[in-house]
Amino acid sequence: MSGDVIVTVTLNAALHVDYAVGEVGTEGTRPISKPGYRAGGRGVTVARVLRAFGHDVLAAGLAGGVSGELIREDLAKSGVPTAFTLIRGESRRTFRFAGPGVPETGEVAADQDRLAGPVLRFGEAGPYITTEELGRFAADYRRLLAGAAAVVLCGSLPDGLPTDTYGSLVTYAAEAGVPVILDAGGEELKHAVGHGPDLVVAETSSADPGLGAALRRLGAGAAAVTTGLEVRVVTAAGGWTAQIPAADLGVVLSPGRGALVAGLVPGQLLGWSWPDRLKHALALAAGGARVPGGLEGRDHVDLAAYERLLDAVQVVPEP
């Protein structure tokens, strides 16, 4: 292990622009609130959650334009150090319009009765990344590995990057002796898993008991496959399934994917048992699912829900 800092990489970071509206409808003109700006992208969320739990983190990736400046400024306000490689293009933006019942600030609601209003989302595709910009990022990334305890690679790739980009980043980390957690899907995952990431986190819309084992055969040290708030993990030592009973969940919005990935990192570094890793990660994911209207709070997790649900997570070994 080279250092003490957990480096998160978000190659398609986003600036979330949030508005509160009196009513969401299909016709007419409606007043909206002053916009709220927040840095986003799954790797950014992972960095926020880890920082909230006291871990030393560094958020890296690609950022450009006014949106890129606002991304870095927002992370600085959260106490998250950054080392983004600057690009000429404008970092992507998402626009979210929250109806009645969603706090204008996007902060975590104090009570569940405020989790009412609908949210409309619109998202830009993101910038085109040139070969020169990728080369500069790769050089920056390799320098960061010297002080990294682990690297977390997350999310989609922006236009211009080859599909094997994550594979190269996994290889660089392995050469530096730094463990890698990869959270990706589609072609990005397909081209990276053979490079031997220590842990792969993959998402599927339906239960696929064979996916984790397949990822292991392709080269992953361990594979965690998520379906909503259920996680199946396959490792060299065996497999486990973790879930939270519906009776304990209460109000559930969309699972906190970034929070779940963040929850798997400490156990990977500290050698926790897999049941303990899964309890921590799934309780965090459920806490992240309680953010009002899908507008994530400052630390992207409801800590009270996390503490309550930690003992409710059921982990069962696979036969």
Regions found by a protein language model. Give the residues of each.
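Glycine-rich phosphate/adenosyl-contacting loop at the front of the ribokinase-like
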Residues: 1-58, 250, 316-319
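Short hydrophobic/aromatic-enriched beta-strand-loop microsegments
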Residues: 57-59, 79-85, 197-207, 241-244
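Conserved phosphate-binding/catalytic region of the ribokinase-like
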Residues: 212-319
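Conserved beta-alpha-beta core of the PfkB/ribokinase-like small-molecule kinase fold
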Residues: 150-210
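Conserved N-terminal subdomain of the carbohydrate kinase-like
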Residues: 52-148, 306-319
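Charged helix-capping and loop-helix junction motifs
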Residues: 135-139, 162-170, 242-248
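Hydrophobic anchor at the start of a short beta-strand
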Residues: 6, 55-57, 82, 180, ...
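Anion (oxyanion) recognition and catalysis
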Residues: 51, 76, 174, 216
